[in-house]
Amino acid sequence: MHTRATSTAAVAAEAARACPSCRSRRLEAFHEHRGIPVHSCRLVSTADEALAFPRGELSLSFCANCGFITNTEYDGSLQDYSVAYEETQGFSARFRQFSEELAARWVEEFGLHGKRIVEIGAGKGEFLTAMCELGDNFGVGIDPSFVEERLADEHRSRMQFLRELYGEQHVGLPADAIVCRHTLEHIHDVGGFMRLVRQAAENNPTAVVLFELPDVVRVLRDVAFWDIYYEHCSYFSTGSLARLFRDSGFEVLGARLEYDDQYITLEARLGQGSDTPLAVEEPVGALADDVALFRQSYAETIERWRDQLAEAAAAGERVVIWGAGSKGVSFLTTLGVTVEIAFAVDVNPYKHGKYMPATGQRIVAPEFLREYKPDLVIAMNSIYLDEIGAQLESMDLQPRLLGV
């Protein structure tokens, strides 16, 4: 038994040293953070539960061969994606507009009318619902966090949801489009996952494959530490994502940066196309420079934010963050914030009355601020500053408003 265990551990260690995207052995560690919450979007019912939230280790490595960035200490067994996972961003009018416009663009660009759409990581089904409505399509959504009660009755005849993780049992589903948004970054073995997507495409050779996920270049250049957390074990640029698709047997039809350059969208089909990089793809060397910049500037960025919060506390100011999702969790845990900030504001009503994992701030509705009257509001995504400012103004509140 001991010999077998040692052998298994050795195999696992060797696998951990290989890039999950291209399998090269050119991983270079550049950033680590110990004891961070293993989930950012799970609903936590009490402050005690929040403070005792399970934690894991983060050690980011950059692949000098393909540009992919991975958490080499990621342990998927620590996570549990279920109906207690609340990732919905659609309660923001700004995000909802972007999502609906993207759905409309894909439906029209790829002629998805009266077609079959399979969405991997469909969440609560909002995006799949939009694609089905816009093109009179039939959709199958796959996600362990799907909540049946959140699907309106009028959509049930044209949509089916499977509350499970995507796997080999799904590659035979008929599909004219295979959609995957904000899911690949949660998967450690990205090469293995793309082999499943390749199998699905081989079973549906005319299907278009449509992906959306965060862009790591902005994270590195802006030293956006709030966008680094345990759930995101895989980080892509447009170049590293396109290289993974080509290596997986896909022709990349297009790629672009969206949503204030925060997200990558990529469209592909089965087959070997040109190996010439698209204009939006950066070379690996340029990404290596961005990694170096992040590494050099990280400590200074953390110190600057800690100083700002300390000054607010010394002045007796009331400070809240706006955005109780992953960015908010990472912002608070990275800075070690506890009593300096008592509340996290969020527009998602399903989060109200819950608590932030690891740091324990209570999550409140925007209306709570009428009585609390904060002096400083820190928006966890600057793209929402106008939206947040308008809500504060509607409540006759005039705090300082900062964006990360």
Where are these regions (language model features)?
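Hydrophobic, well-ordered beta-alpha structural blocks that scaffold small-molecule cofactor pockets
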Residues: R105-W106, A130, E267-V404
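Conserved SAM-binding strand-loop segment of SAM-dependent methyltransferases
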Residues: H155-E168
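A short glycine-rich, Lys/Arg-flanked "PGG" loop and its adjoining helix->strand segment in the class I
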Residues: G191-V208
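Extended interfacial segments that mediate partner engagement and assembly in macromolecular machines
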Residues: L51-L151, R163, Y229, S234, ...
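Short, glycine-/aromatic-enriched active-site segment of Class I SAM-dependent methyltransferases
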Residues: V38-C41, F211-S234, T238-A242
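Conserved beta-strand signature within the Rossmann-like core of class I S-adenosyl-L-methionine
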Residues: P205-P214, G403
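A conserved beta-strand element that flanks and buttresses the S-adenosyl-L-methionine
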Residues: V179
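N-terminal juxtadomain amphipathic helix
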Residues: H2-R94, R256
